[in-house]
Curated annotation (Swiss-Prot):
Binding residue positions for D-ribose 5-phosphate: 30, 159, 257, 278-279
Name this polypeptide is given: Pyridoxal 5'-phosphate synthase subunit PdxS
GO BP, sorted A to Z: amino acid metabolic process; pyridoxal phosphate biosynthetic process; pyridoxine biosynthetic process
Enzyme class: lyase
UniProt keyword Cell membrane present: no
EC number: 4.3.3.6
Self-association state and partner proteins as the record states: Homohexamer. In the presence of PdxT, forms a dodecamer of heterodimers.
NCBIfam families in the record: PRK04180.1, pyridoxal 5'-phosphate synthase lyase subunit PdxS
Record-stated family: Belongs to the PdxS/SNZ family.
Catalytic reactions of this protein: aldehydo-D-ribose 5-phosphate + D-glyceraldehyde 3-phosphate + L-glutamine = pyridoxal 5'-phosphate + L-glutamate + phosphate + 3 H2O + H(+)
Length: 335
């Protein structure tokens, strides 16, 4: 690769990650119109996520969930001074290009929307806009970081008001990082090989359909022109960085099921850099009070007396849903 191109790519990645660091320690709220966006901004949100419907309503509506209408995103962008993010479908590069052209501050390649590509996520390094992506475990997180995500969030189980899956994902990532820190570099290389395997799915499917052995050649491109070995080498470098840092090398937020100030405080206590709140604000009985309380809870997560005061007279939280009752598990979308 051309030396200047490498320098430019690294500079772009620094800029993208720099934006993510600007929202660190804050709350990002899902909004569906200008009025909700203003409520979020007044409550102290560091950014808003523009959607057509909040996840609880997406879940209820069923069908195919797509990127929000351009007019809706523009209306929200015009209403607030804080950064505006928007979601595209997993693997839907055209939706992402439209969002980038609109000038959104960050793109969420989101499992909350119906996936567009059954094999791959977007190669995010081709974009100038930063991306945030969900992850259930360290393998998913590292793959998204390798593809160019500037920020990671837990997937949780969006639209349920149930924090259990977000907690599961935080624990899985954190424990896997501790395991990586105890490993030799040789053992970590083996983990990198395992984490790179999902990129082989398309190649193996085509080989199987063609009656050929499920294996790839050393120089055979499998994703965006990269060979399996090239992907392994890059993932290995990310894992070595994680071993050194003791955490992900990008900002890591909680998302999926945050419905109360206590939920938000729990996520911060578990080491998260901030919190996304989807349905939890505008499906509560008093959105302005709940929004302000969750922002305060993130700011004072380690002060129980303050949390107790914050939690007074904020109305009813959204009605929660048991995970085992769900017909659709959004967290399982993606690779």
């Amino acid at each position: 690769m051309d030396k200047l191109k490498i320098i430019m790519e690294k500079g772009t990645e620094r800029l993208k990650r720099g934006f993510a660091k600007m929202v660190k320690g804050g709350v990002i709220m899902d909004v569906t119109n200008a009025e909700q966006a203003r409520i979020a901004e007044e409550a102290g949100a560091v950014a808003v996520m523009a959607l057509h419907k909040v996840p609880a309503d997406i879940r209820k509506a069923g069908g195919v969930a797509r990127m929000a209408p351009v007019e809706k995103i523009q209306e929200i962008m015009d209403a607030v001074t804080i950064p505006v993010m928007a979601k595209c479908r997993i693997g839907h590069e055209a939706e992402a290009r439209i969002l980038e052209a609109l000038g959104v501050d960050m793109i969420d390649e989101s499992e909350v929307l119906t996936p567009a590509d059954p094999f791959f996520h977007i190669y995010k390094k081709k974009f100038t806009a930063p991306f945030v992506c969900g992850a259930r475990n360290l393998g998913e997180a590292v793959r998204r970081i390798w593809e160019g995500a500037a920020m990671i969030r837990t997937k949780g189980e969006a639209g349920t008001g149930n924090i259990i899956e977000a907690v599961r994902h935080v624990r899985l990532v954190n424990e896997n990082i501790r395991l990586i820190q105890r490993m030799t570099d040789e053992e970590i290389y083996g983990v990198a090989e395992k984490f790179a395997e999902p990129y082989l799915r398309l190649a193996f499917s085509v080989k199987e359909i063609s009656g050929l052995p499920k294996r790839v050649l050393e120089n055979e491109p499998i994703y965006e022109g990269f060979t399996y070995r090239e992907i392994v080498e890059d993932i290995y470098k990310i894992l070595l960085e994680i071993k050194k840092l003791g955490r992900l090398p990008v900002v890591n937020f909680a998302a999926g099921g945050v419905a109360t100030p206590a939920d938000a405080a729990l996520m911060m206590a578990m080491g998260m850099d901030g919190v996304f709140v989807g349905s939890g604000i505008f499906k509560s009985s008093n959105p302005p009070k709940m929004a302000r309380a969750i922002v305060e809870a993130v700011n004072h997560w380690d002060e129980p007396d303050v949390l107790a005061e914050i939690s007074r007279e904020i109305g009813e939280p959204m009605r929660g849903q048991a995970i085992e009752e769900l017909q659709v598990r959004m967290e399982e979308r993606g690779i």
